[in-house]
Amino acid sequence: MTAKQIFPVWKDCTLYVNNETATVHEILNSDLSELLQLKTEFVSMTDLCVYITGCINQNISSITIYWHAYSEVIYALTGIIHCEKISIECGIKSTDNNILYEKPKLFLLRENLAPTELRWKSLIKTKTIKSALSPNQNEIFPKIAHKPSILLEIEEAPRFKEMVSCIWKLVAEEATITSKSENDIVKTCKKLAESQRYTLTNGTVLQNFILVHACLFKLGAVNFWEEMNGKLRQRPELMSKSFTGHEECFYNCYYLCTLLNSIYSYKTLLPEIVDNTRSIHVVVKAYYSEHIDVSYKILSYSTNMMNLFSQYLNFTDLLPYINKHIKIDVSASKQDMIKFLNACLGL
């Protein structure tokens, strides 16, 4: 059963007032329009948001733009010739009070200092557009056959594959980097990856680290991805439009969560455990940490399932083990996936 959408709601810096109306800021700037390869001089904040994040349908009202990756965008908006990063806030986002500002706000962000509000570059004009949604846009998350709803909520723009593939090559395949600040980010990634507890794809721990962070970002979780994407300069020659590593990681995470949820749901059907001295997988412990009545039988069976997946990295090979005891018919939520991915990272 799909949860009822509560309005107003933010999606990619657009405020959806109800099923029929959306409001968004537009920026008049030909330089920015050219950077985004648009055919009009007005750039909607949604266009800019998707350009920076690479994702669609994210529940966000603001974006952070790093100089290292998007210096031309920052200069086009502010006239600043160097900084670390800026943010653009389109309104207030909270659980009970979503409001669009009359004009989007610009802030200069510096480490250990409070944000400083900036003025827009001279000659830049902004306006607010209210638009009626066509009937096929009434649902913010359109349904696509044969895909779980969680996998539809956040879509990718083509840029996201390019972003992930570039970071993959820079960090995991150790492409040549001469910048000290970029090398510092790579070193941080390697250090953080050492804490990883479970890998979801066939690759190195560092490769999985990048894919997991990309997936967490897609799910809207606060993590290290924004730093990686913002502080590593984009290199078109390293980008691939056909990269799918993060998609495999995302799907594997979802289906492992459904298995863990199904195991818990059908716990009374699980076989008895003969050896109750086996160690339990740390990711399993973390995943079930907020559940009640989690027996050793659940933990042990789930650990076996996780170990089997690590061995084969193929759900087809898991089915004989699972299907002889329980049904696989319990879905997973975005929160389930975030919890699981964080547990994989050792967080």
UniProtKB/Swiss-Prot annotation:
It comes from the Viruses. Pfam families: Herpes_U59 (PF04529). Belongs to the herpesviridae U59/UL88 family. This is Protein U59. The lineage of its organism: Viruses, Duplodnaviria, Heunggongvirae, Peploviricota, Herviviricetes.
